[in-house]
Amino acid sequence: EKRRGEVEKLSTGSNGLNELLGGGIETQSITEFYGEFGSGKTQIIHQLLVTVQLPIEEGGLNGHGVLIDTENTFRPERIKSMAEGYGLDPKEVLSKIHVGRAYNSDQQMLMVDKALELATKHPVKLLGIDSLTSAFRAEFLGRGTLAERQQKIRAHMRDLDKFMEGT
């Protein structure tokens, strides 16, 4: 098992947000960004998919990123402009971002297993999900399905914990 001392911090690309998070996003943990539509959650995940590739001395983790996209929000053109802002080759940056589009909660859960497989071939240092709960909300409507939905989300969170332990 990994020790707490091996926790690293990933820069968000924002000094203010890094300060709020105590230096950046911790590895070996789950960090959730939530807010209203249009509040910047997707922007943050795009930023992290770029900063994770930076050298450690520049706030990155020198690794690849995986995105499970449940809302069709991934925008390669945003990644390209962010990469250029860091003086990175946009094509190389995009080649280190592995995107899977999940159309329902079962696919979303399966993609965590696929991300773990991918981590055996590449130094995956970030797994992002945009959005964690949207597929579950769309499939489990009404109060009568709340218990079932929460049970499935809990199973998904356990899978995410396994991913953290396996990378």
Where does each model-flagged region fall?
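Conserved inter-motif catalytic segment of the P-loop NTP-binding fold
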Residues: 60-145, 159
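Substrate-engagement module of ASCE P-loop NTPases
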Residues: 148-167
